[in-house]
Amino acid sequence: MASTELASDVYALPCGDDGTTALSTPVVVSVLASLLERHIARNERDQAAAADGEAARRARAFDSGTVLDMSLHAFLERFSRYANVSPQVYVVAYAYLDRLRRGDGVRVVSANAQRLLTTAILVASKFVEDRNYKNSYFAAVGGLTAAELSSLELDFLFLMQFRLNVSVSVFQSYCRHLEREVSYGGGYQVERCLKKALVCSGEAQAQQRQAASAAAQ
């Protein structure tokens, strides 16, 4: 099936006819869940011996020894349903997870999925959204304690080396990557409407200010 651009703003929560937020799940949740399930299966086949050092210690903090008692799709959906997490946040959270994999070799597996995903979504939400729920609320949605999540957030930030910026071009590249998952994930389509999307790095706002300044001269 050929990919087509839809007129709706995909990177906003679906809305009903009256403009209120609908309860339907953002399509990115389905695509990301499918992608992560394959990552977990591959990572658990290819798990290497644990490394030593500070980064390895922080990475081990995410290992809980237990696995989620629900599907990844249901788990990810909880954050859009109960914490009003926007689809942009899921894209940025996935970008963070990919950086961890490339940098310190931190990979999502069954034993760390709950903690790692909850923390990645929390940090991405703080970067993307103007207003956020408290850590204690996010912790409840993710099935963790507030103290646990706050500690994991700090470990996550150090693993990321506090490099949280996601530029427009990088954001777009991850959108395209998720779109390619359509052929593997059962026909989902990650429609893009980036002009309407929240711009994660603030570059659009900066460009607008520069344009306004130039026009005034």
Curated annotation (Swiss-Prot):
<dbReference type="InterPro" id="IPR036915">
    <property type="entry name" value="Cyclin-like_sf"/>
</dbReference>
<dbReference type="InterPro" id="IPR013922">
    <property type="entry name" value="Cyclin_PHO80-like"/>
</dbReference>
<dbReference type="Pfam" id="PF08613">
    <property type="entry name" value="Cyclin"/>
</dbReference>
<keyword id="KW-0195">Cyclin</keyword>
<dbReference type="InterPro" id="IPR012389">
    <property type="entry name" value="Cyclin_P/U"/>
</dbReference>
<comment type="similarity">
    <text>Belongs to the cyclin family. Cyclin U/P subfamily.</text>
</comment>
<dbReference type="GO" id="GO:0051301">
    <property type="term" value="P:cell division"/>
</dbReference>
<keyword id="KW-0131">Cell cycle</keyword>
<dbReference type="GO" id="GO:0019901">
    <property type="term" value="F:protein kinase binding"/>
</dbReference>
<protein>
    <recommendedName>
        <fullName>Cyclin-P2-1</fullName>
    </recommendedName>
</protein>
<keyword id="KW-0132">Cell division</keyword>
